[in-house]
Amino acid sequence: IVVDLNEQEARAYRLADNKLNESDWDMDLVIEELKLLDKEKIEITGFDIDLIIEIKEDEFDAQKEYDDIKEAVAKLGDIYQLGEHRLMCGDSAIREDVEKLMDGKLGRMIFTDPPYNVNYKSPGGLDYSSTKFGGTGGKIFNDNKSDKDCVDFYTDVLFNLSHFTTDDVTIYWWFANKNNHINRFAFENADWHMSQIIIWLKNSLVFSRGQDYHRQYEPCMLGWKKKKTHYKNKKITNLKDVFNLDFDDYKEMLDVWYEKRDVTQNYVHPTQKPLRLPERALKKSSEKNDIVVDLFGGSGSTLMACHQLDRKCYTMELDPKYVDVIIKRYENYTGQKAKKA
């Protein structure tokens, strides 16, 4: 008999006791009960905390922070510790840089958004470095290579990712559909198996100059190392369960992800991803405390999503100004200071 428990402890005890006895569950009720508990109390119940945690978009104005930076504080080669996360200002294609970032550790999941090699233009047709008609005044490194140079660049990055990750790693690799062949060549060259394409369906279109139809999606390659078995959190085990799912649960299994874009004027990068986008990937392909690798940090969306879901993000960014943006974003959200590693 357990006595002298406060309300949270009593609720956690009831859930844990029933779970130990393998009781039948009304999962909707369980989730509602879990939502009333603090994070540390959820852990003692034996239930997966991912059941109830949903990522929240932060209010950070990445574009304003980027524009306000006159001279970056970060320098090439700098490494920062952001709580459990690591951030390096370095080159993802250079093996030595990635080795320093990983610090002897291996990642279990990859979620990364490399330059698409499309020489991004603003809606007005100007280079993305222009501030007119939607440009940021910055530039995207490695976004205008020849096909051969781009294949070589992607291949180097993918070899590095393979070297510094576990054998059961899953990779999510965003790309531009017009360069599908380049990405597939690089996957093949670096011995990655490409399993399927995931589609991010946006709530608004992108004006696509020179194309018959405007684009409203971005594709992502899902894969793993050839001849290896990748990890996946398999919550649905049989067809009967699928037919009993609510739509909100069922859609988590689909290869089309509908997530709203960030407001375009807030973009610090043209392919910037909302924090909710990595959520289902992180829950499907990693566990709490796993290391998630992102070698193209951008504005820090992967790192911030990992932070909310108790994963550790090891991320690389070549542009020192973006490194400063990521640090400011983390510090604003957590109230903690980044430290030089």
Tell where the protein language model's regions lie, with residue ranges.
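SF2 helicase/translocase NTPase motor core
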Residues: 339-341
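Core catalytic lobe of class I
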Residues: 1-323
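Short alpha-helix adjacent to the SAM-binding motif of class I
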Residues: 321-332, 336
